[in-house]
Amino acid sequence: MNFLVVIVTTVSLAGAASAGEIQNLYQFGKMVMCLGNLNVLEGLEYNGYGCYCGRGGKGTPLDDTDRCCKQHDECYERATDEMGCWSIETYATTYDYTKSKVSGKCTIKCKLESDYSRFTIRKKCKAFICECDRIGAQCFADKRSTFNRSLISYTKDKC
């Protein structure tokens, strides 16, 4: 069953993303599913949700879930503006993290910059982008009660 989940997720993302982007989106998706205790189909519903979830983002967020996506986008902007990460890195870099479940509750811990090997390239960006994704996924979990099914695949032209 896990193999099927990986295939479905990868194929769903492949139409709109490069190979690096797929890996990064896959990592973010795994965080979203773990922290939110969601299955793969529920996790995929965030892509294209509201005005900010998925590719692009504009206008005013429509609810707290959409605000999580706006904050995630802003974190990626800080990665380029303040951390010196390349724009492509925010979507294409892969990073290291650990996840654990205690009493059915998932926790995610991103590898710190100092914990990467000295031979690792762009470790500051890897650590920062992982934190962006972890915080975004935690926001989705915290705001899951605001998730509005009518905002799935929302037309961005309305934003």
Curated annotation (Swiss-Prot):
SMART domains (UniProt xref): PA2c
Entry keywords, A to Z: Calcium, Cytolysis, Disulfide bond, Hemolysis, Hemorrhagic toxin, Hemostasis impairing toxin, Hydrolase, Lipid degradation, Lipid metabolism, Metal-binding, Secreted, Signal, Toxin
Localization, UniProt: Secreted
Keyword check for Secreted: yes
Record's keyword annotation contains Disulfide bond: yes
Entry coiled-coil feature ranges: none
Disulfide links within the chain: C51-C159, C53-C69, C68-C139, C75-C132, C85-C125, C110-C130
GO cellular component, one term: extracellular region
Cofactor notes: Binds 1 Ca(2+) ion per subunit.
Signal peptide location: 1-19
Record-listed E.C. numbers: 3.1.1.4
Subunit structure: Homodimer.
Family: Belongs to the phospholipase A2 family. Group I subfamily.
Purpose: Starfish phospholipase A2 (PLA2) that has hemorrhagic and capillary permeability-increasing activities and hence is considered to be deeply involved in the local inflammation. Shows hemolytic activity only in the presence of phosphatidylcholine (PC). PLA2 catalyzes the calcium-dependent hydrolysis of the 2-acyl groups in 3-sn-phosphoglycerides.
Name recorded for this polypeptide: Phospholipase A2 AP-PLA2-I
Organism: Acanthaster planci (Crown-of-thorns starfish)
Source taxonomy: Eukaryota, Metazoa, Echinodermata, Eleutherozoa, Asterozoa
